[in-house]
A protein has these predicted regions:
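N-terminal glycine-rich flavin-associated loop
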Residues: 2-35, 58-104, 112-149, 154, ...
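Short cationic amphipathic helices and targeting signals
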Residues: 9-13, 74-76, 188-193, 237-249, ...
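Residue-level signal for inorganic ion chemistry
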Residues: 27, 38, 141, 241, ...
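C-terminal substrate-binding/cap subdomain adjacent to the FAD-binding core in PCMH-type
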Residues: 113, 132-298
Length: 398
């Protein structure tokens, strides 16, 4: 279901690329609206559909077509789940630098199409940087191929990038070729806590500007800490840093981070070993679907895109707005990447519905910082009153 709506003409479940092309062609000829569906973890993103005829279930297209460990490349069908692919790659001590939410359910195609970001982007780049080739199905059933299975520099347009974050509006992703990354010989995380909000952000930017190459970095409040399993004090801010490298380089980065933390007024520094860090990053990645505490899953999720230098001031302003509205909330940020995730909790729909003006005020704050704000989760009743995609900023005359 998408915003409570079921496909009026049911599901189509192709088992290979040619069958998927036939389904799309038939829908095109019949003027039927179809929606590509993978694991269904991101179907709530976007405006309600005016028409919904067919759900094109791609989850049966879940094979690894080719895998060349020596070349660090692989080609897979879009219906394979993230965890299934990562398990295959782990046998050769490699991984795909894409860590979207709910990897046991989310498919490769859906993760790319919805641009479901995780925390590995700090060092390893955006998920579009891992894609080297793609096969897509256009809305008229025509198959299109771009790129290939070789990592090399070529001239021309990288058309696959258009489909990452397009939510299937430009075509259905059928197959994807990736470049892979070796797993570091030693990995671990460090949790640094601060008594002041500004100190946590200044420290994060110092890490960003320094000689450390973390795999991931996240900054969050005490509410966020308790939800992912870190027992922090109320009113404290935590910075969680994931690092990975060879033994000596790992120890050197730990030393640099400890020095930076001390010079920025940290209250505590904890080194978390690899076997203990995995559940923390998993909980952080799946923060929006975590229902294990008294707050439950957030009713509203907003994602702001800013420059790294604007994150601190923008988050401070958003916190002021939400404190004034007296609703429970938590904010997770990636200062080095310029991303803010705003989670608002509320039990009653009527209570959340009253936040329309608050959400518009938050968006104005983000826009003043030259950023954009997308609401990835909203109650259905609010989607007609709140600009989900920040289209007013993209089209100032409208």
């Amino acid at each position: 279901m998408i915003d409570g709506a079921k496909p009026s003409k049911g599901f189509r479940v192709p088992e290979n690329f040619d069958e998927a092309c036939e389904v799309v062609l038939a829908a095109h000829d019949a003027k039927e609206v179809f929606v590509p569906v993978g694991g269904g973890t991101r179907l709530e993103v976007g405006h309600p559909l005016s028409k919904y005829d067919i759900a094109l279930d791609m989850s049966y297209m879940n094979d690894v077509i080719s895998y060349n460990p020596a070349d660090l490349t692989c080609t897979v069908q879009s219906g394979i789940t993230l965890s299934a692919l990562q398990n295959n790659l782990r046998e050769y001590n490699q991984f795909l630098a894409v860590d979207g939410p709910k990897p046991d359910i989310a498919t490769i195609g859906g993760t790319l199409a919805s641009s479901a970001p995780g925390y590995l982007r700090w060092n390893l780049g955006h998920m579009r940087d891992t894609v080297i080739g793609m096969k897509m199905i256009m809305s008229n059933g025509v198959a299109v191929k771009t790129g290939g299975q070789v990592v090399k520099n070529v001239s021309g347009y990288d058309m696959a990038r258009l489909h990452i974050g397009a939510f299937g509006s430009l075509g259905v992703i059928g197959e994807v070729s990736f470049k892979l990354t070796p797993i570091s010989s030693k990995e671990g995380s460090m949790c640094v806590t601060f008594g002041q909000f500004e100190d946590a952000h200044i420290f994060s930017l110092n890490v960003f500007d320094g000689h450390v190459m973390p795999l991931a970095l996240a900054c969050f409040d005490s509410c966020g800490a308790s939800r992912i399993g870190i027992q922090g004090k109320s009113g404290r801010w935590s910075v969680l840093i994931k690092i990975g490298s060879r033994e000596k380089a790992f120890e050197r980065q730990v030393s640099i981070i400890q020095d930076l933390a001390g010079r920025n007024g940290s209250e505590s520094i904890e080194l978390i070993r690899q076997e203990e860090e995995i559940p923390l990053w998993d909980a952080l990645r799946d923060f929006g679907s975590n229902c294990q505490d008294t707050l439950g899953a957030p009713s509203i999720i907003g994602r702001a895109y800013l420059t790294p230098s604007q994150v601190k001031d923008c988050e401070k302003d958003i916190r002021r707005i939400l404190l004034d509205s007296q609703v429970p909330f938590s904010i997770l940020s990636q200062p080095g990447f310029g991303t803010l995730l705003v989670y608002i909790f509320g039990g009653e729909t009527s209570e959340v519905f009253e936040l329309t003006e608050t959400l518009n005020e938050i968006r104005l704050s983000v826009n003043r910082g030259s950023g954009e704000l997308t609401f990835e989760r909203l109650p259905i009743q609010m989607k007609n009153n709140v600009d989900v995609w920040d289209e007013s900023r993209s089209n100032p005359k409208s």
